Curated annotation (Swiss-Prot):
Family according to the record: Belongs to the CobS family.
Membrane topology (UniProt): Multi-pass membrane protein
Encoding gene (name): cobS
Entry EC no(s): 2.7.8.26
Cofactor(s) named in the record: Mg(2+)
General function of this protein: Joins adenosylcobinamide-GDP and alpha-ribazole to generate adenosylcobalamin (Ado-cobalamin). Also synthesizes adenosylcobalamin 5'-phosphate from adenosylcobinamide-GDP and alpha-ribazole 5'-phosphate.
Cellular component aspect of the GO annotation: plasma membrane
Protein's name in the database: Adenosylcobinamide-GDP ribazoletransferase
Amino acid sequence: MLPFLIALQFLSSLPVSLPGMPAAREVGRSLLYYPLVGLLFGLLLWLASHLLQGTPAPLHAALLLTAWVLLSGALHLDGLADSADAWLGGFGDRERTLQIMKDPRSGPIAVVTLVLVLLLKFCALWVLVEQGVGAQLLLAPLIGRTAMLGLFLCTPYVRPGGLGQALAEHLPRRAAGWVLLCCALFCLLLGGWVVLLAVAVFAWLRHLMYRRLGGATGDTAGALLELLELAVVLGLALGL
């Protein structure tokens, strides 16, 4: 139960109280529960969409997106903004890229990236609302957080210290493989071709991280999640 609470506290803005400072082993095990947190997000969004039935589609989509951002506390959007600034401002240099990621200030590239991602997600949700969204709302949050588990399983963590290193070093790898397999089968049954799109986007983004940094950071993991969620809702809206 503790690893799930750790995952929920880290990935969401929901009020979660831990009994104390968790051990590194429990922090590593919390990664196994990231997909479950994603599923919980999806269920809450599905419920919100049901309660908003009858609302004009643009407002329905805007409120859904607002709930989505509030649930995560904009944590991963922050990672996306930092990664966007660093990727373009780093000019291909590893150390410069990592240094820019640590800068708390957001440049114009970060702002433009966030606006485009949120605009595209809003438009995709608008289309899905008009089509009658249902169980498909489970997919994007679930795939996004499952991808974080997959990233830490198969990609070195390049920034020493902190939560990310504890996650990477203490992740139970065999159990993680089984969790990924079960999630993949569930998502394939629910989403079909859009899951293959998500896998392709994951592989491409991981390749970019590995080529530039030699691995992943917390910021790039957050960027991965946001871009995968966007890819999934766009794929669903386009009828893939």
